[in-house]
A protein has these predicted regions:
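The conserved 3'-phosphoadenosine-5'-phosphosulfate
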Residues: 30-51, 74, 151-222, 226, ...
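PAPS-dependent sulfotransferase catalytic domain
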Residues: 1-153, 158, 226, 230-241
């Protein structure tokens, strides 16, 4: 079994992946980083959080090998579903979760993250977001990915804001989805470690920064906010973020 932890960029996907991964590890699953090493998947599962990238046949079939050999592990992605990915999900070989956020806050966070990366001289996935329009188009692409995952009935859908404000309830939903027992003593320290108030911004792979709901209202000017409302409006209403 492969647990596929998918997330909108800058929507707590690193936080959610590590929570999911550590819950599974505490329940007897395999360490994905060891799977990556043992099965020579360094070119498939990249970065600290074992990101598979696009769900292409080559990548999916590569990670399917250790799964079919009896290994249970968690991988991360930001990409949308594909025909083969959807087939494997329907067959129960992949169990997907998807976390998303108010795209206005996610867009702001991506722009700021890219700016910090450029200032450090260390390009990252957001370095190209050098202006408002580029960031807007970037987020529109990920809203289409959000739409595709919301159509996946087998996926567990989670809002980042709900993780921040009702962590226990959202963790219970995740545990139920994974088939784990909350009363398992091994899981208690994991759940505690990832509480929003306990999360450390410097924790490797967590990518936890401001974590403030509605921060775009104070950081973007009125014209920019109106553009976001006009562009994202149809999505915002369906996502539950319509003012």
């Amino acid at each position: 079994m492969i647990i596929l932890s998918v997330g909108m960029p800058r929507a707590g996907s690193g936080w959610y992946y590590n929570l999911t991964n550590d819950l599974m590890l505490a329940s007897g699953a395999q360490d994905t980083r060891q799977i990556r090493q043992r099965y020579h998947l360094q070119g498939i599962l990249t970065e600290v959080n074992c990101n598979i990238g696009a769900l292409t046949p080559r990548r999916l079939l590569a990670v399917l090998v250790p799964s079919l050999m009896g290994n249970v592990f968690v991988i991360k992605a930001h990409a949308g579903p594909t025909p083969l990915g959807s087939f494997l999900i329907r067959r129960g070989l992949i169990q997907p979760t998807y976390i998303f956020r108010d795209p206005r806050d996610a867009m702001l966070s991506a722009m700021e993250n890219g700016q910090r990366a450029r200032q450090r001289g260390q390009p990252n996935a957001f370095s190209h977001l050098t202006d408002f329009d580029r960031a807007l188009n970037f987020m529109l692409a990920h809203l289409r990915i959000w739409e595709a995952w919301m159509m996946c009935q087998e996926a567990l859908h989670t809002r980042y804001e709900d993780m921040l404000t009702d962590y226990d309830a959202e963790t219970d939903r995740l545990l139920a989805f994974l088939g784990l027992d909350r009363d398992n003593a091994e899981l208690i320290p994991v759940i505690s470690n990832y509480r929003p108030e306990n999360a450390r911004p410097d924790q490797k792979g967590l990518h936890f920064s401001q974590g403030v709901i509605g921060r775009f209202r104070n950081k973007m000017d009125l014209e920019q906010q109106e553009t976001l409302e006009r562009t994202f409006g149809p999505y915002l209403e369906r996502m539950g973020y319509k003012d």
